[in-house]
């Protein structure tokens, strides 16, 4: 039947010539039917697959964009944490440096104080030793001067002054008079 329709469409109809540009009615109907069939197949089979592929691609792109934004946000948070940690570390380093400086100054002050105390202790001990030696030397000199004075007086007088109580009294009196005369001379 189709073939007949095609055959009929290609012939002249009652003396009217057919135009090669104008399709025959049978061809037109067959073309429309095939176009509808192709459209239906494309609409039912191809378009949903294309839509699904398009949706998958769009979701993948959006997912990648979201992942990139999320990664960028995480990187920004990590950068902020790093900056905060770096600022904390710098503050801690400054604090430790200042503590070390203060401890160094404190240790230096303590060492100076200890050195000063040691110096004063040594000076005091030296003065005490010198004073003790001076007292001892003075006592020895008094005894020696007394003995020499007694010997000299005994020679001058011609009698022995070996009595120790008497000798001691004479020497002490003589030295006391001598000290008084020196004190009187220095105060003038």
Swiss-Prot record:
Cited CDD domains: ATP-synt_Fo_b (cd06503)
Protein's membrane topology: Single-pass membrane protein
Transmembrane portions of the chain: 21-41
Record flagged with keyword Transmembrane: yes
Pfam family, one: ATP-synt_B
Protein's cellular compartments: Cell membrane
Assigned protein family: Belongs to the ATPase B chain family.
Assembly notes: F-type ATPases have 2 components, F(1) - the catalytic core - and F(0) - the membrane proton channel. F(1) has five subunits: alpha(3), beta(3), gamma(1), delta(1), epsilon(1). F(0) has three main subunits: a(1), b(2) and c(10-14). The alpha and beta chains form an alternating ring which encloses part of the gamma chain. F(1) is attached to F(0) by a central stalk formed by the gamma and epsilon chains, while a peripheral stalk is formed by the delta and b chains.
General function of this protein: F(1)F(0) ATP synthase produces ATP from ADP in the presence of a proton or sodium gradient. F-type ATPases consist of two structural domains, F(1) containing the extramembraneous catalytic core and F(0) containing the membrane proton channel, linked together by a central stalk and a peripheral stalk. During catalysis, ATP synthesis in the catalytic domain of F(1) is coupled via a rotary mechanism of the central stalk subunits to proton translocation.
Name the UniProt record assigns to this protein: ATP synthase subunit b
Organism: Kineococcus radiotolerans (strain ATCC BAA-149 / DSM 14245 / SRS30216)
């Amino acid at each position: 039947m189709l073939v007949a329709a095609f055959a009929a469409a290609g012939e002249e109809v009652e003396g009217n010539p057919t135009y090669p540009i104008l399709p025959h009615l049978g061809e037109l109907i067959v073309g429309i039917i095939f176009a509808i069939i192709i459209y239906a197949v494309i609409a039912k089979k191809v378009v949903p697959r294309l839509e699904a592929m398009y949706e998958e691609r769009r979701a993948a792109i959006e997912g990648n964009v979201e992942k990139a934004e999320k990664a960028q946000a995480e990187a920004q948070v990590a950068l902020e944490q790093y900056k905060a940690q770096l600022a904390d570390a710098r503050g801690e380093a400054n604090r430790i440096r200042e503590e070390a400086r203060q401890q160094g100054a404190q240790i230096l002050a303590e060492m100076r104080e200890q050195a000063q105390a040691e110096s004063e202790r040594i000076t005091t001990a030296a003065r005490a030793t010198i004073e003790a030696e001076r007292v001892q030397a003075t006592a020895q000199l008094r005894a020696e001067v007394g003995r020499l004075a007694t010997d000299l007086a005994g020679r001058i007088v011609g009698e022995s002054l070996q009595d120790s109580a008497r000798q001691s009294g004479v020497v002490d009196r003589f030295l006391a008079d001598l000290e008084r005369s020196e004190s009187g001379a220095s105060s003038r």
